[in-house]
Amino acid sequence: MSLVYFASGDSKADIEYQTISSTATQVSQEQSERLHDRISKAQLQKLYELFKSAPGQVVGCGDLRRMLEDVDITFNDFAYTRLFLKINQNHDFMVDWNEFVSYLIFGFQEEDPSSQKEALIMPISMAPVVRKTEHRSAVCCITLLKVKSDQTPMEEITESANYSFGGEDSPENSGMWVTASHEGQLRFWSAHMEPLRSAVSESIYCMSYAFYNNGKTHSKLVLGDYAGNVRILSYSPYLRGPFQAKPGAALVELVWADVLRGRIPLLIPREYINLHNELISCVYFSLHMNTLFASAEYRNTKKYRGRCPGLIMVSNEDRNNFRIPLGVSVFYVSEIKNILVTGGPDTFVRIWDVYISSEPSAILTGHNGGIVAVFVQPEENKVYSVDYHKIIKVWDLQEHTLLQTYGDLVRIIHHSETDIKYYYHSHLRELMVAGRKLIQIKCCPRVRVDLTDGNTHAAPVSVVLYNRLFRNIVTCGLDSYIIVWDPWTGRRKIIMKNCHTKMIYGETIDIEITAACFDPLEQFLLTGARDGSLKIWNYNNAVVVRNMSIQPDQEVTAVIWVVDRILAMGWDRQVTEFNDVEGREYGDPKKWAKFHTDDITCADVKLGEGVVTATYSGEIIFWKLETGQPYRRYNVMDPSRFIELKLNAEEEKLTRRSKRMSSLIGVNRRSTSVQAIKPDEIKDYGANIPVSVQAVLFLQRRPMTKEHGSVFISLDTGIIQVYSHHQHGGYIKQFTAVHKTGDCVLTMATDRKNRFLYTGTAFGYIKVWHIVNYCIPKAEQTYVCMPRLRLEFIFLRKELFLTRAKRMVRFQPEPMLVSSYKGHLKAINSIGFINLPKIIFSGSHDYSCRLWTQGGRYLGTLGTVLPWSKLTPFERAGEDNRAYRLPPDIKKVASSTTLKVISGIQHSFTLKRPKAAEEREEEREVEDTTTDVKNMFERPLREPILGKHFQLPGRSAIEQRIELDTTQLYIPVYTHLRVYPSEMLEALPTSPIISQVKAENYLDHYMPVVGKVDLNTSAINIKEPQKLARTKAGANLDQPRASAGWAKPKTNSILGIPRAGSSLGKARASVSQGSPKAGVSSGYGKVSVSQGYPRAGSPRPCTTSLSKPKTSSSPSKPKGSFRLGSPIAATSPANADSSPGKRKSSPGKRSFSPGKAKASPGKARISSVLGKPKAKTDRETH
């Protein structure tokens, strides 16, 4: 909306107020009004003289413009009007020298980098972690087994020290804690305070260690003793230096005298004898400055009279004494800031420049006990100090002011424990406190950018506003903060803390800000709080201009600022009007008529026409803006019914019944002695549960007619009702604005032309509705170009299936849902829209305020530590076609719709064409055939498939990573391995077939000798049994029948042993599908088949082929074969071919051994595995 305002302060010039949404040209808008960037010292001096010479030393709008043109500073009309409104802080359209200079100062303050580092929350805001120490006595020392050096090189210091990506803070990169107690016990803890191991060692009073990770600089081990001496051991960290493990020596003891004499070449000693006259309390060596710091306490005031060197800095041969009364107990050296912070028994914290020892830069007072620990956070500009009474104080390093006093340690640690040890982990930003308990306190922890983009406020954001004059965003939160942001750079310009407060029992309590708005010229800010207080702010300089209040302790839920009037509504159930006219602003406020019967939850105004207010019980009342008189009243439960503007008897009865039922239910919860409620009363009460109104919105561009829906009412049921604010108008339509059960719209906004409606829900969803043709006459409806909307809103593009958001509105043509995505994890309390760059901003209950493009792309979170996207108020955001990222917290819970809308990427998909009937029939036939084949051949194996076998124990879910230190000479590998407990292995049962083979006799598988031995012919006549002969009746006639007798080999005895020199090739057997270890028995003589033994006197070894024998079809060359467990069928030796060229032997050769009279059972056996012996023909055998 464009607002025109004419003032008569300057008779020669009228001021016309315009915004960036006005009709000004683009060139004029881009001209900056940053006067402090264009003015010089000489020009400022000349302007001062012109102000002094002006009448009354004040100038008007035209006079100031002529003065600026005299010093060569020119602006166009649009830019100068905005500049004059910014300078005119008194709102009187006259400018004096003080206002002019104040505007220049504010411009320079906005560019101050220190204003960006002011914290929104206390440095120590998280609950501490407490654990038992597991020591027998109290902890006397605590330190850190470091993985990284605390002394970061100066060239590695960057601005990213305030946030981490998660990997740097892992325990593997953070080291281990080490605690020691008086009994000499050491315990090692992980970074998350998990116990690792314990050991026993001798205690050392004072020690410090300095090293670099790169290993280029010698490490320093600094020792301080009771006599005030300081000794330094320097050594190279290469291959662990003198700390290398030696085989057979678990502990190496050194004598200091041997170290001084140089008997240990790896150690370079240096001594500072009697550096202090008292016990060394703390030592530190700075590698960056190559300087030693050592402190001591001097409590004997009579002896030293307050001129004691509490801290001595030694650099080469130069010594600087920092003289402090009572000495120094602890100190901290910040090499980044070049400062030294000391604390001692005098309860003062002193800040020194390391190069100036004459006097401290600042003295911080406030402790009531001696200082026992100090440390500095240079990135946050904070100093932490702990006193003897266990009170932690946080100081600002630049302003030297107290930020926080933390006293929870007094509650956690018993008052009798006084010897407490402290250690600060600079990498994790954690303070470890050790006594009889281990306490871990987080001090300004880094932001995990892998989990969140950061927070805008320290509490839920309640109101977010955009100022069109100064082009900035103002956020108000329940932490009572008001913050001014530059949305184009993401920088925080101004922060105002403790805006609304009240005193309760002497303690100042912050009050939550619940409502806010700007004045018509958008120069001042009006805020309302939960206690009923109202304040007017000049938020450019954080000055309260005026204080007001409605009824005490009544929350302000809505504020409206129109010309010369301020309207405030809340839990007082009426409208309170304050004057905004000069001279009458401090009079009594005007109370409008009290027609509401419940608390007012929301309100809105249409300039020049009317005001609408809504209550928790669903009442809606339209008021005349000029007179404050109501003219229409509705109830959202029955919106079409006309309700007179008075309480009748029926409404009073319903009100009394509702109050009665509420009281009865409350009493029934507290006590069971109350009588039961009647069923009809419960039914009546359930039917009259009120539906509350969450938000109302006036459409400023729609006229006041009966046909135009100009008011949108959001209910807690998720429905938005549309009304006409005409006298004879009323309820028109309603639509469902959510897609999840239990959700509702909490805030609404629209653009300048009322084309889109932006809603924020209780579940964190942001929805955009196209309302151009919704609830207007058909004659005024316009054509909607859907392709253009699909280009801007990716939500409208087609998907493979309807998502939840689209399913809820598929039968709802108007209004059209053009975008829906989850923007926050919690409820959205405020939403707004910037017209020219098309940016949506939302404030949520999750402490953040985020910026989005109109299409749904994520631009950033105000207050983030990450780099900000490049934005400008004159160009549309989101048109660079780059890849947009998702908020880390939303990425974990986002749906497919949210991922598509925020990222702007829609994955392609293909729709399958429905197949014809013939193709489906063919596929069915193929499937049936495949099923039959599978049923026949592909039967599943029986369980268990592997049989009974030994199963290995399962591995741990966490893989054990073993890293061996190869620098040691002796590596005990077994200490790194995980050994499983030994268990008795189950003896597997022996298979029945193996047991049968073991008990069998190999002679049972051969034919008995039925014939007689002819000694003259030296032949063995073997006759087959009749039963076996009958089995061969069906043999194939094409193959020659196997002979039952052996071919006449030459033998030397009746036992049938072959003579030496006989040819083995004439008595050859072919073995098929049998074991190579087989023996053949024939009559009294036996032939043994052994491995690799040649026959005596034979020219070459006779081998038996293990391959399947080939049967020739020629009857002149028959070949015999036998099966496993069957009688042997031998062919005539005359037909056997013994030539090696015709048959190749297999790799596993077998030869007949002439000297063996008996076959060995272990080497030659034919077992009947397949059953009883059975004679077959040659064709069946093959």
UniProtKB/Swiss-Prot annotation:
InterPro entries: EF-hand-dom_pair, Quinoprotein_ADH-like_sf, WD-EF-hand_domain, WD40/YVTN_repeat-like_dom_sf, WD40_repeat_dom_sf, WD40_rpt. Keywords: Repeat, WD repeat. Gene3D superfamilies: YVTN repeat-like/Quinoprotein amine dehydrogenase. Residues 1079-1092, 1103-1121 have a biased composition (Low complexity). It comes from the Eukaryota. Transmembrane segments: none annotated. Residues 1031-1182 are annotated as: Disordered. WD repeats lie at residues 155-199, 323-362, 366-405, 456-495, 508-547, 595-635, 740-779, 823-862. This is WD repeat-containing protein on Y chromosome. The lineage of its organism: Eukaryota, Metazoa, Ecdysozoa, Arthropoda, Hexapoda.
